[in-house]
């Protein structure tokens, strides 16, 4: 690179980047009864003429399922907003369908095993990928598509969409879509998982206008911290205890626990009468045919 940086500036940049990554992962990995604090306003100054209600930042959170009852966002305050822009966090409670999704920010050596399990069990999934993943893991992307899975958009650089201009949001999404298409041949990309779980009315509108459905989740746990893995049994119990009809399951592919527990999770869900479906089924459900 031709531009040279002062060491102090470089250290500051690295620290800021790491803080941003940590914050993003924290917000993507809920571990409490409510996954994150209720909706909060972004750090824009309301006195700034550029600020508007459409820039208010929401951090996705939900009340976890208990005893098979559907997870809820009623207490979060953003339910009507998601409905207005066609976003989803779970499917219909009618029928016993589950939708398996993975967030792939970077590769930690477990995605191949996850794909092996999905292939063995005949389960479809959607993998939400970032620009880093696209650039570093082209062969895994090809395998995902070849084996019938969907690749969704998790943005190019994992930013807070509520702080980006409309143009920057479009650039973030278009670049992922374009490069995934170049690598895999998947021309259509319809599903978006907002990076860090942060969104605004404006980001919902901009992404909807680009043809995306924002896909949140109704099952998750703190699985993203690779330094605090607690074993396959822990992963299994956290997911199975939250199962409910129509659930969208969020797992992070960096988790060793998830990779080791996935087969048992699928088997137990099926034992309870659940069927794993593609997100395409959620958005365009086929009529149930008589046996």
Residue ranges: model-predicted function:
Residues 105, 130-132, 156, 195-197, ...:
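Active-site beta-loop-alpha junctions enriched in small/polar residues
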Residues 110, 159-184, 198-245, 258-260:
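Alpha-helical scaffold elements lining the catalytic groove of polysaccharide deacetylases
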Residues 61-162, 168, 172-181, 188-189, ...:
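Active-site beta->alpha N-cap acidic-glycine motif
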Residues 243-280:
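Catalytic grooves of carbohydrate-active enzymes
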Residues 113-116, 139-140, 203-206, 261-265:
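A short acidic, amphipathic alpha-helical/loop segment
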Residues 98-101, 125-129, 150-153, 190-194, ...:
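Structural recognition of the beta-strand scaffold that forms the well-ordered cores
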Residues 2-100, 107-114, 120, 274-291:
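N-terminal pre-catalytic segment of deacetylase/amide-hydrolase enzymes
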């Amino acid at each position: 690179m031709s531009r040279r940086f002062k060491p102090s500036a470089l250290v500051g940049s690295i620290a800021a980047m790491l803080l941003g990554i940590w914050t993003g992962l924290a917000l993507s990995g809920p571990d409490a009864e409510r996954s994150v604090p209720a909706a909060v306003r972004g750090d824009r100054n309301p006195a700034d003429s550029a600020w508007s209600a459409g820039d208010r930042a929401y951090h996705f959170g939900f009340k976890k399922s208990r005893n098979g009852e559907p997870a809820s966002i009623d207490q979060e305050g953003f339910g009507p907003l998601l409905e207005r822009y066609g976003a989803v966090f779970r499917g219909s409670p009618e029928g016993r369908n589950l939708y398996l999704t993975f967030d792939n920010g970077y590769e930690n050596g477990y995605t191949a095993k996850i794909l092996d399990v999905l292939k063995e069990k005949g389960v479809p999934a959607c993998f939400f990928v970032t620009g880093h993943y696209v650039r570093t893991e082209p062969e895994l992307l090809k395998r995902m598509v070849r084996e019938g899975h969907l690749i969704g958009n998790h943005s190019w650089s994992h930013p807070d969409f509520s702080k980006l201009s409309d143009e920057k949001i479009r650039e973030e999404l278009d670049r992922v879509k374009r490069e995934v298409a170049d690598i895999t041949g998947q021309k259509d990309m319809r599903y978006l998982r907002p990076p860090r779980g942060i969104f605004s009315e404006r980001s919902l509108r901009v992404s909807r206008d680009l043809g995306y459905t924002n896909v949140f989740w109704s099952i998750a746990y703190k699985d993203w911290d690779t330094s605090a893995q607690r074993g396959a049994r822990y992963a299994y119990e956290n997911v199975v205890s939250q199962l409910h009809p129509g659930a969208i399951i969020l797992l992070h592919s960096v988790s060793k626990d998830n990779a080791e527990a996935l087969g048992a999770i699928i088997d137990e869900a099926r034992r309870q009468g659940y069927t794993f479906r593609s997100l395409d089924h959620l958005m365009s459900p086929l009529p149930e045919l008589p046996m």
